[in-house]
Amino acid sequence: MAKEKFERNKAHINVGTIGHVDHGKTTLTAALTRVSAEVFGGDWREFDTIDNAPEERERGITIATAHVEYQSEERHYAHVDCPGHADYVKNMITGAAQMDGAILVCSAADGPMPQTREHILLSRQVGVPTIVVFLNKADMVDDEELLELVEMEVRELLNEYDFPGDDCPIITGSALMALEGKDDNGMGTTAVANLIKALDAYIPEPERAIDQPFLMPIEDVFSISGRGTVVTGRVERGIVKSGEEVEIVGLKDTAKTTVTGVEMFRKLLDEGRAGENIGALLRGTKRDDVERGQVLAKPGTITPHTVFEAEVYVLSKEEGGRHTPFFKGYRPQFYFRTTDVTGTCELPEGVEMVMPGDNVKMTVTLIAPIAMEDGLRFAVREGGRTVGAGVVAKIVQ
């Protein structure tokens, strides 16, 4: 049987369900596929096939994730759903499932619970741009005032973590009803269809990598006699053209130079684009002025920093991580893009130690500056062995 052709003409958006255990994330995920399939065709997924998500290894971390897809008028959605709370934590911190927006599922019968809060906090820390809310199990609540109260609580919680709680769309309904193809008082299929409309309206289309300012992590440096210095790497975003000025950022003082040529597979090109492995010839740059771990970037678009707040997941013993906890003053290496830099960890007040398998907010001070911005992912390593994964939540200096 021939594979169905992937529709390129619709914008592609990555989303995921977040929220407290048993509030209906997986049921809603299944309902979304059903409601969308009935309008736009495509397959709909049964609850069980999503709930028994296969485990994947992402950078040595075991994460169980279900991937489903569905469509709306304008868009093609790729949606991730995780069976367990720990899987969410790992997924969001490693960026294994990059989300352009999240669907927060909250039971109208229970209101916000501890993981509701934790997932909103995580979304803030890892830079999920937007949240749309589905108040689930509304068919179990007879009291209109109670629904309004829960909605108010959710909005306050979003505001608390710097999301625009007053403007976030909140759709009220029953995922189970929609999954069973029912629609009493518009709470089933209609509510889920409205949720899809809210995703369309409220989650902005992400800027494609090619349209962002140029950045290339430097992997290798060569000196070619008579030509100068060539740096190689994979262009992370943007385009670099021959003749353009770039900055070399990180590890040392920022330096400006000009790209006098771009090569790929030993052929000269006019430009290097996001996703391509290229060599860039730099004018007047000595072999010793550049090193692996720095980045080549469009001038003024990224700056070097040494102190930042991060959200870190510490690998469990089973994942090949540490067997023992660590304490404040812990000094591992932080692997950014292509290189390790040693740094010291400061733990939040009241946190004395961090156990393998935990996630923790920490402030890190590096011994050398790295080109960084909020949302940058890194690995925590000890002598080349990965013991954690993290994301820059906020740059301090």
UniProtKB/Swiss-Prot annotation:
G2, as annotated region: 60-64
InterPro entries per record: EF-Tu_GTP-bd, EF-Tu_GTPase, EFTu-like_2, EFTU_2, G_TR_CS, P-loop_NTPase, Small_GTP-bd, T_Tr_GTP-bd_dom
Gene source species: Chromohalobacter salexigens (strain ATCC BAA-138 / DSM 3043 / CIP 106854 / NCIMB 13768 / 1H11)
Lineage: Bacteria, Pseudomonadati, Pseudomonadota, Gammaproteobacteria, Oceanospirillales
Family listed: Belongs to the TRAFAC class translation factor GTPase superfamily. Classic translation factor GTPase family. EF-Tu/EF-1A subfamily.
Statement: the UniProt record of this protein carries the keyword Nucleotidyltransferase: no
Assembly and binders: Monomer.
Domain tr-type G: 10-207
Name listed for the protein in its UniProt record: Elongation factor Tu
